[in-house]
């Protein structure tokens, strides 16, 4: 499982264009030490299967970002990774969004090109979900109600804004507002400092590069 996750980290580094030694060290460390990843190893008899799902998710992102027609194998990888664990689609989306953010930070980047990349990633994700839903219902038409599995593919558009805001709220609560009891005070302080420092550095970068003036006109 660790070997597969290490390979997944290589896909992430390549997809995001990170070439420094620091990135090569920190990205695998973050992937292996993230809380959900650590909990994965509490079920050692399934760890290798979940690691395959993570590898497929990261490989899908790599195909999508690296090649013009990479969305084709990318869709295949995302469908297969959802077949192992649906939540790994969120991992792929997170890496894709991070890639778009890094693209915007490049001095030679054009907002129109980044926007097209974002649309491409969104469409690929939607197609992957549709293909996975169709295949899963063909193979197992009587889906059970575990965690709302029988409602998969059904989305109330009216509730969508609230669901998106709730997702951000949960992330903020996990790291800052309402951390779990197993998170020590020191870890909580480090989380808060890291979030504030990241926000400050991003704002300072945009101000220094004056993106607020010309990012939409380049």
Which residues fall in each region the model found?
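Luminal/periplasmic active-site loops of membrane-embedded glycosylation enzymes
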Residues: 144-179
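Membrane-interface transmembrane helices that cradle and orient dolichyl/undecaprenyl
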Residues: 57-71, 105-108
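Membrane-interfacial loop-to-transmembrane alpha-helix junctions, especially the N-terminal start
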Residues: 18-27, 69-71, 114-121, 210-218
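Membrane-interface micro-motifs in multi-pass membrane enzymes
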Residues: 4-5, 22-65, 83-88, 92, ...
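Hydrophobic, aromatic-rich transmembrane alpha-helices
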Residues: 173-213
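Perimembrane helix-loop-helix junctions
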Residues: 91-126
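Juxtamembrane "helix-exit" motif on the non-cytosolic side of transmembrane helices
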Residues: 33-43, 104, 134-142, 204-209
């Amino acid at each position: 499982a660790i070997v597969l996750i290490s390979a997944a980290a290589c896909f992430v580094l390549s997809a995001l264009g990170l070439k420094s030694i620091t990135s090569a060290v920190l990205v695998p460390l973050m992937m292996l030490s993230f809380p959900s990843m650590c909990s994965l190893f509490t079920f050692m008899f399934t760890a290798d299967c979940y690691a395959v799902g993570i590898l497929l998710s990261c490989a899908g992102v790599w195909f999508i970002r690296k090649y013009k027609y990479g969305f084709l194998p990318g869709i295949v990888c995302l469908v297969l990774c959802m077949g192992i664990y649906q939540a790994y689609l969120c991992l792929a989306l997170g890496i894709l969004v991070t890639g778009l953010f890094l693209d915007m930070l490049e001095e030679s980047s054009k907002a129109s090109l980044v926007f097209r990349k974002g649309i491409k990633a969104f469409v690929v994700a939607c197609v992957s979900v549709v293909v996975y839903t169709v295949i899963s219902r063909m193979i197992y038409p009587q889906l059970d109600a575990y965690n709302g599995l029988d409602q998969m593919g059904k989305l109330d558009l009216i509730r969508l804004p609230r669901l998106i805001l709730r997702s951000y709220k949960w992330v903020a609560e996990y790291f800052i507002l309402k951390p779990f009891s197993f998170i020590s005070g020191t870890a909580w302080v480090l989380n808060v400092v890291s979030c504030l420092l990241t926000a400050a550095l991003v704002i300072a970068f945009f101000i220094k590069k004056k993106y607020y003036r010309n990012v939409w006109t380049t």
